[in-house]
Design a protein with these regions (language model features):
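Conserved N-terminal alpha-helix of the aminotransferase class I/II PLP-enzyme fold
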Residues: 25-72, 95-101
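Conserved PLP-enzyme active-site core in the AAT-like
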Residues: 5-8, 12, 16, 44, ...
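N-terminal "arm"/small-domain region of PLP-dependent enzymes with the aminotransferase-like
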Residues: 1-33
């Protein structure tokens, strides 16, 4: 018998512990994702998702793990042979690189020690050197270390180029402001 003092805690980036009200909601009957009750829920939460992500743009929920969302972004935003810049400072920055290579993209990497934030000036320098880069792939927060990267500053830099900024916000959204429209 475990007491409240000896409750096991999940100290991982995922899965995470659930609040009691979430556990209660998960105990309800399932609804079909192609029926009206589900559509009504999606219609109701869409405006809230926009506020959460700091955007006026439509937000598209995906029914997959975070890696699936990263794969969806790369496969839908770029074509085989496109050049992308990956700035990595941990496991999930490396995941961007792996996904991009697997999709047939030409990857230019900037690697930093785990636990360090990506210096925006390095992104600026590389984009000046390589104006043919179609996209910059970064984390808002590197899940493996907890470091928040300066997405706002990097967004200002990418707006001055033709490169599309693609941000993995999986471990940042909900715990740190992520004003996507302002960041670009």
């Amino acid at each position: 018998n475990r007491s409240m003092l000896h409750k096991e805690r999940l100290l991982t980036p995922g899965p995470t512990e659930l609040a009691p009200q979430v556990k209660a909601a998960l105990g309800r009957d399932m609804i079909h994702h192609r029926k009206d009750p589900f559509r009504q829920i999606m219609h109701r939460i869409q405006p809230e998702l926009g506020r959460l992500f700091g955007t006026e743009q439509p937000v598209m929920p995906l029914a997959c793990a975070g890696t699936g969302a990263m794969q969806a972004a790369v496969s839908n935003l770029f074509r085989s042979g496109d050049k992308v810049l990956v700035a990595k400072a941990g496991k999930f920055g490396q995941r961007w690189e792996d996904i991009a290579r697997n999709q047939g993209l030409e990857v230019d990497s900037l690697a930093y020690p785990w636990g360090e934030a990506i210096p925006p000036e390095d992104i600026a320098d590389r984009l000046k050197e390589r104006p043919d880069i179609a996209g910059v792939l970064i984390q808002a927060s590197e899940t493996s270390t907890g470091v928040l990267h300066p997405v706002g500053a990097i967004g200002r830099i990418t707006r001055e180029s033709d490169a599309l900024l693609v941000v993995d916000g999986i471990s940042a959204v909900g715990i740190s402001p992520c004003p996507m429209d302002r960041w670009g």
